[in-house]
Amino acid sequence: GSEMCIRDRHKEIFMTTQTQQTLPPSIFPARFQILSGSALKLLACILMLIDHTGVLILANWKPALRVLFTIGSTEVTWYRIVRDIGRSAFPIFCFLLIEGFLHTRNRRKYGQNLLLFALISEIPWNFVFSNTWHHPTQNVFFTLFLGYLGLCALEALWEKPVLQLSCIVGLFGFSYIFHADYGWHGFLLIMIMYLFRTRRILQALVSTLWMNYEWKMCFSFISINMYNGKRGFIQGKAAKYFFYLFYPVHLTILVILRQILFLS
């Protein structure tokens, strides 16, 4: 009866499909939509590796800090170039979080995995910035987990807007004081990208305006608009957990390399 109608309406409003025909309008024509979810995940990991190589290796290597040229008052170094390239990783991960949330068979397990790897990643994250067991900020998995909770609130409470807004404001406040990577800006970016998920061009414009202090992130929406709605080559638990593990493992390797090359 009415309960079935509510569920159907809920599905119609909030769920998207994996088929090419029902993809949201893109900046690019269909022939350029060639990136699967797996390809986007691989790209985001590569960009993140480039970024963190800048943080841990190039920041300590004097040749990478030499000024190549200036643009206005900005001094351009190899370190700066690498960090700017890496800025594109985060919006892609936000996009993949939303896609995963919409299409996963088990949302509770999805959230548990995000929290588990946030906890696992905290030790290498702390060593990245303070080279100790403790650092006042938290890793990006916590940002994604808070975003996941926000998505749960948006969907579960869509018929109770006051309670829904209260939950989002509460999560926003927590993200502000918790100091996870990208902070409250990152949390609200996930909410913005979700709300504009069926309008990719608007999603790109509003997200870029929101994260204007990191304007280099706008380049991530080129690849996001090349998404074809397909899962891609990542199949099975082993491949899935490889990408979860990539974050803490690559941080650990880079921390060890920094210690060997510059701090020992």
Name each model feature, range by range.
Residues F14-S264:
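Alpha-helical transmembrane segments and their immediate juxtamembrane cytosolic regions
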